[in-house]
UniProtKB/Swiss-Prot annotation:
Keyword Transcription attributed: no
Catalysed reactions, semicolon-separated: a ubiquinone + NADH + 5 H(+)(in) = a ubiquinol + NAD(+) + 4 H(+)(out)
GO cellular component: mitochondrial inner membrane
rRNA processing among keywords: no
Gene symbol of the encoding locus: ND1
Protein name: NADH-ubiquinone oxidoreductase chain 1
The protein's enzyme class: translocase
Gene Ontology biological process terms, A to Z: aerobic respiration
Main localization category: mitochondrion
Length: 125
């Protein structure tokens, strides 16, 4: 029982820095592009634009209100979540000092999981 709890916390401690790094790199990209275009950039929400990144991420998930008429609504709205799940699942197989999952055929599993993103694209219409 404790092994599962430990594995879950190890997984969380690996994925949270990945998500924060993506948010920080998005912040840096927006700031650099803002300075290149001689504008200040979006710095009006929260603590030095960090809250704006999470607001933008949330907006990307709930922004699309127009759905194709022939699309299944459950599959159409579950496709972004499937994309995010697959992307975060692939980070578990990165070669680090103590990987969350250490499998013999992890490269083959990474290739198989990365090919599943096609189904998320098909589900989104």
């Amino acid at each position: 029982m404790y092994a599962y709890i430990f594995a879950f916390f190890e997984l969380i401690t690996f994925l949270v820095p990945v998500l924060l790094a993506v948010a920080f790199l998005t912040l840096v990209e927006r700031k650099v592009l803002g300075y290149m275009q001689f504008r200040k950039g979006p710095n009006v929400v929260g603590l030095t634009d960090f809250c704006n990144l999470f607001a933008d991420g949330l907006k990307l998930f709930i922004k699309e209100t127009v759905k194709p008429s022939s699309a299944s609504p459950y599959l159409f709205f579950a496709s972004p979540v499937l994309f995010l799940t697959l992307a975060l699942l692939l980070w578990n197989f990165m070669p680090v000092t103590s990987p969350a999952l250490d499998l013999q055929l992890s490269l083959l599993l990474v290739l198989g999981l990365s090919s599943l993103s096609v189904y998320a694209i098909l589900g989104s219409g």
